[in-house]
Each structure stands twice: as C-alpha cells, then as structure tokens.
Amino acid sequence: MRATKGNENVFVDCGFPPTEAENLRIRAKLMMALTGYIQERKITQSRAARIMGVSQPRISDLVRGKIGLFTIDTLVNMVTAAGLKVDVDITARSPRAKNKRVA
C-alpha cells in the first residue's frame, strides 16, 4: 500500500473541478457545524428545525449529509438562525498549489 499526499480539498482529490470543489468544501464545513450544533445541544430534529427556520425533513437531510440539497446561502441562513457566526477568510493560493497534482 502506498500513501499519496492529497490536496487541501478532498473534493479536488475526488476529481471535481476546482470551483465546484471549493463550493462543496464550504457547504460541507457549514453542514458539519450545524450537525455539531444539534449534537452538542442534544436537541431533536424538530427543535433544530424550529430554531433554524426550516422543516424537520430539511434537518434530516442535513444530518444525513445530503450536500447536494443545500446551497451556501441556505446553510449560512441556518447557521445565523442558530445564533452561530460565519467568518470568511480569503487568501491567495500558492503558485505550487495551483499546479500540484496527485499521483
């Protein structure tokens, strides 16, 4: 077995185009934060839905990781409704990262 160092974004490693991979990475991070919020507070999906202003089935989709059903916009609204704060950090890519390939 041989290990290969991957990209900083697992979605790039899975073959997604860079822009789509970045969108997926951001959505996954937001979804993990919301799922963590629900688990840490030990609240029901119904309670989480009321807090976040969505339906219980939407919370079910969230905790089951149905990433394709959520936009960044929707997830940010849910995070904000939960009383959490979203910080955005934008940095320049290193020249090496742009040309880096996984063997």
Locate the predicted segments by residue.
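N-terminal flexible/basic segments that precede or flank functional cores
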Residues: M1-M32, R93-R101
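Short alpha-helical DNA-recognition segment
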Residues: R41-S60
